[in-house]
Amino acid sequence: DKPLLDTARDFVIIVVFSLVLFFILRFLISIKRRNKRKQLHLLLGPSEKQFLDFLRLNYRQGYVSGHQIVAFFGKHKSSPESQRQFRAKLIEGLNKSLGLIFPGEQVLDIQADDKDQRMLTYRLTDSMYQALKNL
């Protein structure tokens, strides 16, 4: 058998190595998160950033309607066609930007409105909300 001093030294070496490995992994994870935050900041335009914040704030309440999105951006006095174009451009920009940062992830959960089947309601998917929350 080994003397007690050698066993204690081996134990201390294992603990120190484990701690160093743990801190290296934490550091690498934080660098990856920081890079994703930077990418998000660079790729999203001002309207897409506001739209993403709006979707994140309303995530727990459920789906947001097209009317709510238009009212949030102050476009409610525009013609219905320009409102539709604005929403389409906003959603397309958000989908493209987040699709580049999180490849393979579905960004929005889009459903028909219960009251008016012609209108759509929007919500971040659960996986996207969690990914953004962890940044």
Regions found by a protein language model. Give the residues of each.
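Short amphipathic alpha-helical recognition elements used for nucleic-acid or partner binding
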Residues: 41-77, 94
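Short, positively charged loop/turn segments that connect secondary-structure elements
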Residues: 75-86
